């Protein structure tokens, strides 16, 4: 898998992810929460050949990076792990990295150094230990 990074308003981003973010099956996996982007986002997109197999949009706010939703084809943990490793390596270690993580992926985040801060029914707020 190759991971590419695109700014939140990059034309290529829309070409790559539009078929997914408007797909009812992908939206269902995201609990019908819409994906959004602005110029403050960097998208980490996992590609296999010419196909998108996952993505993590990361919003850069003043004092933190935020992962608020993401998509991984077939819920493959290995894809999620590779995308997360890229996010961690490409974000400034001096800035907090937090995630609203699906309950079913909490262990992958823990393996990569995230700690739980708050648990809800479907999600866990997690913070990267830096």
What name fits each language-model region?
Residues 45-59, 66:
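Conserved beta-strand in the GNAT
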Residues 23-43, 47-48:
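Active-site rim helix/loop that mediates acceptor-substrate recognition in acyltransferases
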Residues 1-30:
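Short amphipathic alpha-helix that is part of the acyltransferase structural core
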Residues 90-102:
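Conserved GNAT acetyl-CoA-binding A-motif
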Residues 119-130:
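STAS-like cytosolic regulatory interaction modules
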Residues 69-71:
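Residue-level recognition of conserved beta-strand positions in structured domain cores
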Residues 101-121:
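Conserved active-site alpha-helix within GNAT-family acetyltransferase domains
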Residues 75-92:
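Conserved acetyl-CoA-binding loop-helix of GNAT-fold acetyltransferases
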């Amino acid at each position: 898998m190759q991971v590419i990074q695109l700014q939140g308003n990059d034309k290529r981003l829309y070409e790559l992810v539009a078929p997914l973010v408007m797909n009812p099956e992908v939206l269902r996996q995201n609990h019908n929460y819409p994906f959004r982007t602005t110029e403050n986002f960097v998208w980490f997109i996992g590609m296999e050949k010419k196909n998108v197999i996952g993505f993590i949009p990361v919003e850069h706010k003043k004092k933190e990076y935020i992962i608020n939703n993401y998509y991984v084809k077939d819920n493959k943990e290995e894809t999620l792990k590779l995308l997360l490793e890229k996010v961690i390596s490409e974000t400034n270690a001096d800035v907090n990295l937090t995630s609203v993580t699906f309950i079913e992926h909490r262990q992958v985040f823990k393996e990569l150094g995230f700690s739980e801060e708050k648990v809800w029914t479907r999600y866990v707020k997690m913070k990267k230990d830096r």
